[in-house]
Design a protein with these regions (language model features):
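Basic, amphipathic alpha-helical bundle interface domains used for macromolecular binding and assembly
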Residues: 40-45, 58-60, 67-77, 288-289, ...
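Walker A/P-loop
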Residues: 217-259, 330
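P-loop NTPase nucleotide-binding/switch module
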Residues: 171-208, 212, 239-295
Length: 512
């Protein structure tokens, strides 16, 4: 007997339809799965066998062959347990083929027949809806993801026996209700810029970074507030749109970072990996490529604290910095394997922080630096030029003065700063509408020439400093992009000399 059911797996950040073909024939009892299954899929034989038996359902004691198509796509994870079990029941005659038709099944089977939660269900549901499927069956543990997608009926059977009863119309399940999240907005979280004392220049730099999507390097002594400032950047970024919310929630679903309580990622991500993070954990990778910290920071902030310390033995930072410029430039991480080449989104703001020297006190007003010149030079050379070239704003973070620390005057709140950022982003949204560009930092050369018109005085100033400081062509373009953002914050159509002066200061204030 032959039967066909449908399941799904995850490929990159999207679902991929899998055809599950089951053939039961005479011969010595056996259970084979073909079609490039990984270890987890091969192990489903024992899970399916035990689940059927412990659910009071018949497991055929004959030869069973399961084919997972397309055969050239590697299947990983345990989400195919459920369609395999339904396929066996259909081929054995316990279910009719029409009872399983027009439905997609996703879930891992426990040995007692219950259906366990799996990662990546949200992109699977979205794929099913986009390709015309009307029904999908997922674990109850993934119900929160099922409530996010309308236009398709999502069912959550607790067990295999409950699913069979529903398919036979003996006991009907109710599709999940849909939630409305279009009007939900995230707050500013538990931290706020109003808590930051002093550091007006750095706060201004972060406001410009948020408004234009620019990358930032902060250099300062230990305890100067670099980490505190970086953690408050997401609180001034614009609220995410519905599409951005769904996109980042998809990524977190694939990474297994959603739970029953957290069904939507409403706040922009802030990721801060330790400097011992592996290359594949940072960029993404693995034998079956999975998203790394760069992709988990999509639509948000990636913070690399103590940047030179990422260069632990093995030269890992050099490996990373040879790969980081590509996603920073393109907004996409591409990972190539023998079976396939996968792309993960990586449109983010990179915030980095470091000490000015190994001891941390070079230029400090209180402590004396104990480093030798060659030690300082070696410390700075740990960070590659290509990465530094793509950091638009490089700003010094001075030690906080006692008077600033004890000042009881509350600074501007994140909400106030965010309102200015949102207004500037609105100007950019209108400017780049339909182009695929979201903010000034992403402009290409053609857009730079079109939208960044400098007044004569601004042009003269930029030319003067370009020659005096020996700036590169890329640095020139990035200064102009930052100046464009400053002009947007001030509501100016043209880029003025004051905008160029501030952009140059933000780029060149840190001595390298």
């Amino acid at each position: 007997m032959y039967a066909k059911t449908f399941g799904e797996t995850v490929c990159g950040i999207n679902g991929e339809e899998i055809i599950v073909e089951v053939d039961i024939s005479n011969g010595l009892p056996g259970f084979d799965i073909v079609g490039l299954p990984d270890t987890a899929v091969k192990e489903s034989r024992e899970r399916v066998r035990a689940a059927l038996k412990n659910s009071g359902l018949m497991f055929p004691m004959t030869r069973i062959t399961v084919n997972l198509a397309p055969a050239d796509l590697r299947k990983d994870g345990s989400s195919l347990d459920l369609p395999i079990a339904v396929g066996i029941l259909t081929a054995a005659g316990s279910l009719l083929q029409e009872e399983a038709e027009g439905k997609i099944f996703v879930g891992e089977l426990a040995l007692d027949g219950s259906i366990r939660q799996v990662a990546g269900v949200l992109p699977m549901i979205l794929y099913a809806r986009e390709h015309g499927w009307r029904e999908i069956y997922i674990p109850q543990g993934n119900a929160a993801e099922g409530e996010l997608v309308d236009g398709i009926d999502v069912y959550t059977p607790a067990s295999l026996s409950e699913l069979v009863s529903h398919l036979k119309k003996q006991e009907r399940l109710t599709p999940l209700p849909k939630i409305q999240f279009g009007t939900e907005t995230a707050g500013c979280g538990d931290v706020d810029f109003a808590e930051v004392r002093g550091q007006q220049v750095v706060k201004r730099a972060l406001e410009i970074a948020a408004a234009g999507g620019h990358n930032v390097l902060m250099v300062g002594a230990p305890g100067s507030g670099k980490t505190m400032l970086a953690r408050r950047l997401p609180t001034i970024l614009p609220p995410m749109t519905e599409d951005e919310i769904l996109e980042i929630t998809k990524i977190y679903s694939i990474a297994g970072l959603l739970n029953g309580k957290k069904q939507l990622v409403l706040e922009r991500p802030f990721r801060s990996p330790h400097h011992t993070v592996s290359a594949s954990a940072l960029i993404g990778g693995g034998s079956v490529p999975k998203p790394g910290e760069v992709t988990l920071s999509h639509n948000g902030v990636l913070f690399l604290d103590e940047l030179p310390e990422f260069s632990h033995p093995g030269g890992l930072l050099r490996w990373r910095t040879n790969h980081l410029p590509q996603p920073l430039e393109d907004g996409v991480v591409t990972i190539s394997r023998v079976q396939a080449s996968l792309s993960f989104p990586a449109r983010l703001i990179l915030i980095t922080a470091q000490n000015p020297c190994p001891c941390g006190f070079l230029g400090d007003k209180v402590h004396s630096c104990t480093c030798r010149p060659h030690e300082i030079e070696r410390y700075r050379r740990k960070i590659s030029g290509p990465l530094l070239d793509r950091i638009d704003i490089q700003v010094a973070v001075p030690r906080l003065e006692y008077d600033d620390l004890k000042d009881k005057t509350e600074g501007e709140s994140s909400a106030v700063i965010r309102s200015r950022v949102v207004k500037a982003r609105g100007v950019q949204h209108k400017r780049f509408e339909g182009s695929g560009v979201h903010c000034n930092a992403q402009m290409n050369k053609k857009q730079l020439n079109k939208y960044c018109k400098l007044e004569p005085q601004a042009e003269a100033m930029l030319g003067k400093y370009f020659a005096a400081l020996g700036l590169s062509a890329r640095t020139h373009d990035r200064i102009v992009k930052v100046a464009r953002t400053i002009a947007d914050l001030e509501g100016s159509a043209a880029i003025k000399a004051a905008h160029i002066a501030e952009a140059i200061q933000l780029r060149t204030s840190v001595q390298r």
